[in-house]
């Protein structure tokens, strides 16, 4: 949010460059996007048919990247993940560590944010699947 130009350079223009290059060599592009392309204001889980409505720079820049892929590349898969967790430091492990730490007396979290945590190993398995299939 503090550097929108950089966010767009990486998430939109950088993604456009990858899409153009993938198309030029006939490669399949597998893109990891985010659930931040949605507003988060609906009372249901989002799916690929819901209309994107990002509320922050990150989501807007990632959505712009998705649009570039759809415009410039004919073989692509867009995977939208949220709260990726696995071995190492990530949001979910940070919260779990804080909950287990007896020296932490208070933990403040949003009561309005809902997400579906994504296992890093499961995400890797899905990426491998899309690499191998020929339909995309």
Regions found by a protein language model. Give the residues of each.
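Short amphipathic alpha-helical segments
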Residues: 2, 19, 43-44, 90-92
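Conserved cofactor-binding/catalytic machinery of classical short-chain dehydrogenase/reductase
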Residues: 6, 14-17, 28, 50, ...
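Short, hydrophobic alpha-helical segments
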Residues: 131-135
């Amino acid at each position: 949010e503090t550097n929108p130009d950089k966010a767009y350079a990486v998430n939109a223009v950088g993604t456009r460059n990858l899409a153009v290059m993938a198309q030029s060599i006939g490669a399949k592009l597998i893109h990891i996007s985010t659930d931040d392309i949605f507003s988060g204001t609906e009372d249901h889980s989002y799916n690929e048919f819901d209309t994107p409505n990002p509320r922050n720079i990150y989501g807007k820049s990632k959505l712009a990247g998705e649009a570039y892929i759809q415009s410039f590349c004919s073989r692509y898969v867009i995977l939208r993940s949220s709260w990726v967790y696995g071995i190492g430091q990530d949001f979910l492990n940070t919260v779990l560590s804080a909950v287990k730490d007896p020296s932490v007396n208070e933990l403040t979290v949003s009561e309005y944010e809902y997400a579906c945590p994504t296992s890093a190993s499961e995400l890797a398995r899905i990426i491998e699947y899309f690499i191998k299939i020929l339909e995309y």
